[in-house]
């Protein structure tokens, strides 16, 4: 089977690109290793103003806004910033877990009738003057004019293409987990000590007047730096 563009990776980046190309009249398909769009764990936790502006341009921002939590305050290095005066129609960030972001985007690309080849991975590819043959984990292949790697920071497509990923060494590392706690901690929020910065908070929460109110029950998000 042949497409104009094949996208390796059906996460937020891959689905958004597929939607944009489809709206431009391009025959595009997604190759996604997961059998469904279900996502285990928290991963990303929200959207920023510019992202919401782009979603608004496509007429789908309200799908995210109705499910998320708006916050007009953000923080950096312990300093809080008021976003209410930002020159945008959306002067806030939106708290919304990636599993919900992906579900909403998947519904959008489904409406656009973007084909998604699920449960398979790109294992390699061979280019020529007219396109690229994409090898798949099932032992078959697909043909396209272009292959786009939207398969994450450890992108197999990027590595196979020999594309460098320059940058500086990390100065900190983070561990993120979801846990069921036997006892409720005395205090939610961010802690700082000699070992670094740590945070505890329920995965489900509400934002009211710039303050976070955590759910009484459910898994706890843990961040350790």
Where are these regions (language model features)?
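Core Rossmann-like FAD-binding/catalytic domain of the broad FAD-dependent monooxygenase superfamily
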Residues: 1-225
């Amino acid at each position: 089977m042949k497409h104009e563009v094949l996208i390796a990776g059906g996460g937020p980046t891959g689905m958004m690109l597929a939607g944009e190309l489809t709206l431009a009249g391009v025959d595009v398909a997604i190759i996604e290793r997961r059998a469904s769009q279900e996502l285990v764990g928290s991963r990303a936790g929200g959207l920023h103003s510019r992202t919401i502006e782009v979603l608004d341009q496509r007429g789908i921002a309200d799908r995210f806004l109705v499910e998320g939590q708006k916050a007009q305050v953000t923080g950096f290095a312990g300093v809080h910033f008021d976003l209410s005066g930002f020159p945008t129609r959306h002067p806030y960030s939106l708290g919304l877990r990636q599993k919900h972001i992906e579900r909403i985007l998947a519904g959008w690309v489904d409406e656009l009738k973007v084909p998604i080849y699920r449960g398979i991975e790109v294992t390699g590819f061979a280019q020529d003057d007219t396109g690229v043959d994409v090898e798949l984990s099932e032992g078959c292949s697909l043909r396209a004019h272009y292959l786009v790697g939207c398969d994450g920071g450890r992108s197999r497509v990027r590595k196979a293409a020999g594309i460098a990923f320059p940058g500086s060494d990390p100065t900190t590392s983070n561990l993120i987990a979801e846990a069921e706690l036997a006892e409720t901690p005395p205090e939610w929020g961010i802690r700082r000590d000699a070992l670094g910065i740590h945070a505890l908070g329920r995965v489900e929460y509400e934002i009211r007047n710039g303050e976070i109110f955590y759910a009484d029950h459910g898994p706890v998000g843990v961040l350790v730096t």
